[in-house]
A protein has these predicted regions:
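Short beta-strand segments enriched in small/hydrophobic residues
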Residues: 1-14
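Active-site nucleotide/adenylate-binding loops and adjacent lid/helix of ATP-dependent enzymes
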Residues: 1-4, 58-59, 103-198, 209-211
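Short glycine-rich anion-binding loops that position phosphate/pyrophosphate groups of nucleotides
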Residues: 9-11, 70-72, 149-151
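Glycine- and acidic-residue-enriched helix-capping/strand-helix junction motifs
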Residues: 11-27
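Conserved N-proximal alpha/beta basic substrate-recognition cap immediately N-terminal to
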Residues: 24-126
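A short glycine-rich, hydrophobically flanked beta-strand micro-motif that places a catalytic Asp/Glu
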Residues: 47, 188-194, 201-202, 283-297
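Phosphate-binding site of ATP-dependent enzymes
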Residues: 170-252, 262, 266, 273, ...
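ATP-dependent carboxylate activation and anion-phosphoryl transfer catalytic cores
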Residues: 212, 256, 262-346
């Protein structure tokens, strides 16, 4: 059995660009994990131009693909095309199938499905044009967070995205739909979502919605924001998330933007239940990370989004790395579970 690790790359000025994947640390982590699992593997760069040739080669062998491609399909970021090609070739693979990938790429599509399934998610309105913005703060409930429908790693979200006036919603909508966005962001559609004042959590979910009994969660963790940050700024903005400061500033005390911590046992049980429900509602398959916030006043939990094909790493500077550390797990444990779900006997 050979494991092909499909890693997303683009071709820029005649050179391969491996985004954040092509690092010595990433390769070492995978090598160590597969050594622990006693599995042979290949690091395979995937671009939109070599995809079909690689698929043809993989299909000729007894292989399984560890699919790490998580792009949104624009500007050379391979993602949905990879999943569709794997499905057409009937190759076993880890991660989201094409249905889950498509749903989870759009925050609006996720929210519609969660609402239909009775999973609590903050109120929202799509801002398809400027004509219906008057009164939105009163209808949805201020403060609002204005953000792109398609966005990863907080792309298109600023501290000033949190607003309480209709005119500010309109201005942000017009700015986002015309501005140059980060690579994993498409702001042609923008929406306004009620901002939930309170703590933030994240939960790693695994399984297949078609078999609800297979869906399980790793222990939830709280994303604890730096205490020196003003209370109203404790949310993920792009500049603070990446430490790329242009119009914003780092935490006043010079410490990290946030750290992760264990959750209270009672809260953890609630988080696992709602995360599992959200994962099933958006037709989760493979694995994903569910982001949630708790209303400080009411104690109610709300699901923000379900991130399919989230990053896999043991690095404790990453969300998954911190989750694994607090759960007492290794990357090999997580990959082994994902590969078993894909039909690999370990």
């Amino acid at each position: 059995m050979l494991i092909w690790a499909f890693v997303p790359y683009s071709v820029r000025e005649g050179r391969l660009d491996g985004f954040d994947f092509d690092t010595l640390q990433s390769k070492r982590e995978l090598a160590d994990a597969f050594r622990s699992l006693n599995l042979a593997w290949i690091w395979q760069p995937i671009t939109e131009t070599n995809l079909e040739a690689v698929i043809e080669q993989v299909a000729c062998e007894e292989s399984v693909v560890l699919n790490l491609c998580d792009g949104i399909g624009n500007r050379g970021t391979p993602g949905p095309c990879v999943v569709r090609a794997l499905e057409r070739a009937r190759i076993r693979f880890t991660g989201a199938d094409s249905e889950f990938y498509e749903i989870s790429t759009s925050k609006l599509a996720m929210k519609e499905r969660m609402k239909s399934a009775g999973v609590p998610t903050p109120g929202w309105e799509a801002l398809r044009d400027s004509s219906g913005i008057d009164g939105i703060c009163a209808r949805v409930g201020a403060p609002l967070l204005v953000k792109p429908d398609i966005s990863a790693a907080s792309g298109g979200v600023f501290l000033r995205s949190k607003v309480s006036r209709d005119d500010d919603v309109r201005a942000l909508r017009d700015e986002l739909t015309t501005a140059t966005m980060p690579l994993y962001c498409d702001a042609r559609t923008v929406f306004a979502e009620r901002f939930i004042e309170g703590p933030e959590f994240t939960v790693f979910a695994i399984g297949n919605w078609r078999d609800p009994a297979s869906v399980r969660c790793l222990p939830p963790v709280e994303r604890v924001f730096n205490a020196s940050i003003p209370e109203g700024e404790k949310f993920l903005s792009y500049e603070r998330y990446w430490g790329l400061y242009r119009e914003e500033r780092p935490p006043p005390d010079g410490g990290p933007f946030y750290v992760y911590a264990d959750c209270d046992a009672q809260v953890a049980r609630r988080l696992e239940k709602i995360s599992r429900d959200a994962y099933i509602a958006v037709r989760g398959r493979g694995y994903a990370r569910v982001d949630l916030r708790m209303d400080r006043a009411s104690g109610d939990l709300f699901v923000l989004e379900v991130n399919a094909n989230c990053g896999l790493s043991e690095d404790d500077q990453t969300s998954t790395g911190c989750i694994l550390k607090l759960a007492g797990m290794t990357l090999a444990d997580l990959l082994g579970s994902s590969l078993k779900d894909a039909g690999v006997s370990l």
